[in-house]
Amino acid sequence: MNADKIRIFSRRRVLGWLAGALIAPEALAQITNHESRITPFASVVPGYRLQFPRDEGSHPEFRIEWWYITGWLNEATRPLGFQITFFRARPELKHANPSAFNPRQIMVAHAALSDPSHGRLIHAQRAARDGFALAGADAGRTRVWIDDWRLQQEENSYRARILAQEFSLELECAATQPPLL
């Protein structure tokens, strides 16, 4: 490199550091200033008594929650392990934005299949914001979805539908024990 390129690179680096130093205190203040939230998160409080099946659905006032199913499938040729998880996260909103594009809830789903014949875990994931009926989590009984991925509580079971590139799962799962808290 010649001296001009080194000088330009050094100036850019110094300017970047200066800009970061000037912006960092404001960014840190916004992150730590919980009073500026327009939509505060609900707190988990001791003594709350969960009521099932009502509490198996979404609680959108909380920051994060998830629905998780794991199990073994006894296929004729080999056993298969599976895992399905749907996450719901509520981002911190600093301003009232009536737009349907405003991400009030973020949905993330992950599914995996352990098939010994593949020699590795096969997995897929999806993410979307709620709205436009593309993703969501219902309050009350469990019903979470992203596009055509679904986990839904029926009367005495859960139905899961995962259509991924390398695998698909269509499951009906029944609880074998009461909820474990």
Segments (PLM) and residue ranges:
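Targeting-peptide/extracellular-domain and disordered-appendage signature
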Residues: 16-17, 30-181
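N-terminal secretory signal peptides and thylakoid transit peptides that target proteins
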Residues: 2-20
